[in-house]
């Protein structure tokens, strides 16, 4: 399971020009699921993200988590995080999980994040063609792959 986490001052996701999820200060999370992912990846990744100290404290140091600042979270599914560009110029998405495997894990990720943070998690729509707008604060962008835990 891969995630691109961006510290944002605001972010929104739209489908057919209609906003379906929006946040102010917090985290914009793009989540990609592969066939070998399972519930243990969801648990590990949500705990890791919720505790990442990437927000500044009173001294200007990155020392606070999204929970510490009562921040918000926007989650958007993105199978292209598992693109392989080793051959040719057209990406292969063979490692990305099929929807019947990925959708329940995506929903589990959202449920788990909702249990870890105070404000409700905003989302896009799994598998939809979406437009994402955000203001990356910092900028701070972090990439995490659950297959690289150690």
Language-model segments: which ranges?
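A charged helix-plus-loop insertion that forms the helical arch/lid used to bind
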Residues: 87-101
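N-terminal, polar/charged subdomain of small-to-medium soluble alpha/beta proteins
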Residues: 1-89, 104-150
């Amino acid at each position: 399971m891969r995630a691109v986490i961006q510290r944002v001052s605001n972010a929104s996701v739209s489908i057919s020009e209609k906003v379906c999820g929006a946040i102010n200060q917090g985290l914009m999370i793009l989540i990609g699921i592969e066939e070998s992912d399972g519930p243990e990846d969801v648990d590990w990744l949500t705990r890791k993200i919720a505790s990442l100290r990437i927000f500044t404290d009173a001294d200007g140091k990155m020392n606070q988590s999204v929970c510490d600042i009562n921040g918000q979270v926007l989650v958007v599914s993105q199978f292209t995080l598992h693109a392989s560009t080793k051959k040719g110029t057209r990406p292969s998405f063979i490692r990305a999980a099929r929807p019947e495997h990925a959708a329940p894990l995506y929903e589990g990720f959202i449920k788990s994040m909702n249990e870890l943070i105070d404000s409700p998690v905003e989302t896009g729509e799994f598998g939809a063609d979406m437009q994402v707008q955000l203001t990356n604060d910092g900028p701070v962008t972090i990439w995490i792959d659950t297959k690289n835990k150690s």
